Amino acid sequence: MALRLLVAAFAVAHAFVSPGRALSTPRRPPPRPATTMAARIPWRTVFVCEYTAPLLVFPAVSKAGPFSTLASTLWTVHFAKRLAETLFVHKFSKGTMPLTNLFKNCGYYGGAAALVAWDINRSGPYGAQLAKLFAQLSTKTKVFVGAWAICEVLNLYTHLHLASLRSDGSREAKIPTAWPFRRVCSPNYSFEIGSWIFYSLATRSPAAWAFTTLGAWQMATWSKQKLKRYKRKFKDEEAFTATHALVPGVF
C-alpha cells in the first residue's frame, strides 16, 4: 500500500514539474511583447526648427527703431549662420532624438527671442539718440560688435574643421587638430559664449545676459563631459593635447 502511494505521488509531481527542473524552482511567466518605442525625430530636423523659431519670433516682436534694428540684425545673422551650418556643415554622430525635444528646444529659443526683443524694446539705451543704423554708435559699442563678429567667424571655422573630420561619412570621434583645439576641447562653445557676451554688452539687455548665462552654463556642462570622454578615448594619442574644456588654463 505504501509503495502504491509513493508511486502515485511521484506521478503527480512529475506531471507538474518539467524534466530537469528542480521542484523548488518556480516557473517564469512568458516574456511580454516589446512595447512601442517613443516617437523619435532626426537631429537635423530638430536643429532646423529650433533655429528657425528665433529667426521668426525676434523680428515679429521687435519694434522699428535704429537700436532695435541693430540688435535684431546681430540676432538674425547669428541664427541664420546656425541654420546654414545645420543644413550644410554639421555631421551628426547620432541619428535621432525624442520627439519631445523638438517642442522643448523650439519653446526655449522662441521664448528667448521674444523675451530679449521685448526687453530691448523696453530699455534700449540708444533708442532715442540714433538717427540711422550704425551711424552714431559709440566707439565702445562698435568694439563690442566687432568682437561679436570675430567670435562668429571663429565659431564657424571650428565647425568647418569638425565637419572635415567626418568628410568620409564616418560617425567615429576623431582628434581635432586645428589651432583652437590645441589646449581647449570645445572652442566652438568658447566662441559661441563669447559672441553672446559681446551681444549682451552691445545691447545692454538684462534678458540677453540671462540668455547668455543659461546657454554658457549648458555649454560648459557639455564641454566638461566631452573632455572626460576624449581623455578616456585618446589618452594614449600624442595628437590629443587639450587640457581644458572652454578656456585655456582656467576652465
Where are these regions (language model features)?
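Hydrophobic transmembrane alpha-helices
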Residues: 1-16, 57-65, 130-251
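N-terminal signal-anchor/initial transmembrane insertion module
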Residues: 1-63
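Hydrophobic alpha-helical transmembrane segments of polytopic
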Residues: 3, 7-10, 43-51, 71-78, ...
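Juxtamembrane interfacial secondary-structure elements that flank transmembrane helices
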Residues: 16-31, 80-94, 118-127, 156-166, ...
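Juxtamembrane helix-capping/reentrant segments at transmembrane boundaries
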Residues: 27-47, 93-107, 174-181, 242-249
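Hydrophobic alpha-helical transmembrane segments in multi-pass integral membrane proteins
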Residues: 59, 109-127, 191-199
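Hydrophobic alpha-helical segments and helix pairs
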Residues: 66-119
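Non-cytosolic membrane-interface motifs at loop->transmembrane helix junctions
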Residues: 95-101, 128-137
